[in-house]
């Protein structure tokens, strides 16, 4: 649909012949023809070139949302979901009451430190769920390490998660 609208609005605006549906289909085919031979293995993941942004949401102790523009653009401000690299925190939708309780504590502590502030991203990549994966800094403070050192998260290498037994304890 984008290609058709682009042709109609940009390429053909002053040409009566382009207003016919068959001409739009021909133009659309020419624009998208290169896609016919593309497969998944021919493509690369898109890693947004984001270096910093304002924290607008803290989902849990290892996932935040930032607002940022793409560099060198006047364009819109986008929101990006960012997973803190190298850490795992209790899950808000965890399997035990204790894990959910710890997740709220972890989220609230992280939120108190970074919500509404400008953070810087380093070692940016994409993770399997489509989120940005990055080291997050607030000034000189490496937020990821701070969460681990203060007991609100555990180290995580991206493989199998190893939940501490304390997350499974339902006693309060």
Q: Residues of each region from the PLM?
A:
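Small beta-barrel nucleic-acid-binding modules, primarily SNase/OB-fold domains
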Residues: 1-172
């Amino acid at each position: 649909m984008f290609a058709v609208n682009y042709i109609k609005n940009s390429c053909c605006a002053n040409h009566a012949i382009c207003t016919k549906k068959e001409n739009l289909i021909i133009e659309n085919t020419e624009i998208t023809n290169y896609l016919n031979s593309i497969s998944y293995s021919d493509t690369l993941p898109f890693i947004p070139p984001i270096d910093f942004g304002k924290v607008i949401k803290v989902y849990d102790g290892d996932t935040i949302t930032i607002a940022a523009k793409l560099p060198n653009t006047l364009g819109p401000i986008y929101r990006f979901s960012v997973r803190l690299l190298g850490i795992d925190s209790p899950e808000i939708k965890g399997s035990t009451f204790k894990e959910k309780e710890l997740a709220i504590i972890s989220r609230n502590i992280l939120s108190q430190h970074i919500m509404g502030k400008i953070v810087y991203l380093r070692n940016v990549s994409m993770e399997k769920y489509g989120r940005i994966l990055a080291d997050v800094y607030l000034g000189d403070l490496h937020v990821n390490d701070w969460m681990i050192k203060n007991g609100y998260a555990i180290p995580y290498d991206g493989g199998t998660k190893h939940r501490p037994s304390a997350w499974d304890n339902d006693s309060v």
